[in-house]
Amino acid sequence: MRPGGFLGAGQRLSRAMSRCVLEPRPPGKRWMVAGLGNPGLPGTRHSVGMAVLGQLARRLGVAESWTRDRHCAADLALAPLGDAQLVLLRPRRLMNANGRSVARAAELFGLTAEEVYLVHDELDKPLGRLALKLGGSARGHNGVRSCISCLNSNAMPRLRVGIGRPAHPEAVQAHVLGCFSPAEQELLPLLLDRATDLILDHIRERSQGPSLGP
């Protein structure tokens, strides 16, 4: 494909998505990366998945290419990654209903659950800790649970971004819905960079072969 081909497809997609007319599938693999969160609370711990998507878009040079799509109820951007194409998605529904946006976009782009990455916060890991989970249960995360329900599968690979768990169980809701502290905010740029590196490296490796290995 000529240089800029994927970016041109992204610009055409912004005009065509309102009619659900999609660009032809590129010759390489196509993957979706969905950042889970609450659209009205972008700076909170619970929406750190959306922050990772923002950094991913900047890294791939499509930070100004987000398009709001009413069919998916999400912001979408297309980005090239070698011969592959990434569909970046930020749901515009509340966390508990994120799966509806993810499943609709997967349907429109012809993606299986295994081709959909979820990026989300993880209470049981300290801030700065990252882990890639290849499918499995939701582990109590409502956004992941919604995706499993709407996709009828638990096979989605997930990038879990640690936000730490408060000492008192009754403080969990306030913790996840709260903003990062000033000290935590100093760690965020490096964390977002590392998360972006991890997911891009994993997608590159999978694009070169059929396995789902880490």
From Swiss-Prot:
GO biological process: rescue of stalled ribosome
Catalytic activity: an N-acyl-L-alpha-aminoacyl-tRNA + H2O = an N-acyl-L-amino acid + a tRNA + H(+)
Amino-acid positions noted as binding tRNA in the UniProt annotation, renumbered to this chain: 96, 142
Keyword annotations of the record: Hydrolase, RNA-binding, tRNA-binding
Disulfide bonds: none
Pfam family, one: Pept_tRNA_hydro
Listed GO CC annotations: mitochondrion
Enzyme class, broadest EC rank: hydrolase
Residue numbers marked as site, Stabilizes the basic form of H active site to accept a proton: 121
Active site location: 46
EC number: 3.1.1.29
GO molecular function: peptidyl-tRNA hydrolase activity; RNA binding; tRNA binding
Alphabetical list of Gene3D superfamilies matching this protein: Peptidyl-tRNA hydrolase (3.40.50.1470)
Function: Peptidyl-tRNA hydrolase that cleaves nascent chains-tRNAs that are not stably fixed in the P-site of 60S ribosome-nascent chain complexes. Acts downstream of the ribosome-associated quality control (RQC) pathway to release non-ubiquitinated nascent chains from 60S and 80S ribosome-nascent chain complexes. Does not act on ubiquitinated nascent chains, which are cleaved by ANKZF1 for degradation.
Protein family membership: Belongs to the PTH family.
Protein name in UniProt: Peptidyl-tRNA hydrolase
Protein species of origin: Homo sapiens (Human)
